[in-house]
Amino acid sequence: MNIKKNLTLIAYLLCTFMAHAQQKLTSPNGNFEMTFELDAKGAPVYTLSYKNQLVIKPSKLGLELKKEDANKQTDFEWTDEKPNQADLDVKADLYNGFVLKDAQTSTFDETWVPVWGEEKEIRNHYNELAVTLDQPKNKRFMIIRFRLFDDGLGFRYEFPQQPNLNYFIIKEERSQFAMTGDHKAFWIPGDYDTQEYDYTESRLSELRGLMKKAITRNSSQTPFSPTGVQTA
């Protein structure tokens, strides 16, 4: 019996299981549940349920970076070798080919007093899941941090300092929100540099038809899309 080979196989199987294992996170009151996993192509995928009813279907996460120009020295992080076009195509991919390196959960609860506003005190209470994702093909990693509150979910991408991800331009955000129906939303037009809008209440399907009415023109408003919104 080759004990060394068996131990190696067990370690490999454990790593493979860890790389694809589904992670779960619940809100402090237990009403919301989020799941996170990697699909067959190593793409990050999440879902969200409320009281055991799915509200966000499997939705992918990730970023598409601006493809670097091999003929411009200033565009990419310097190496002695000039990259070929295929390598640059792969390098622009920050949405596939990940493996799960680590997953950490935590809870945070504080109450703070705003200087002014409608509420005397505001409670900041959430459960957190931070997943560290390695991308072997590009020798880099990123963290996706989820925070699940009693009234909703938030997440962000984090890029710790590392040799192969120092400078980059985001071409396209590939974060998906695959809603399960034509839900009601409280929204303002998505803008480049302001939130100076009144909120509109409507179904998701009504966004395009109401966009012009929602824009009360002033010098600070520059909507970027007829359906681009910030929602609540």
Predicted regions and their residues:
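N-terminal accessory beta-strand-rich subdomains and adjacent acidic, glycine-rich linkers
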Residues: 24-232
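Bacterial Sec-dependent N-terminal signal peptides
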Residues: 1-24
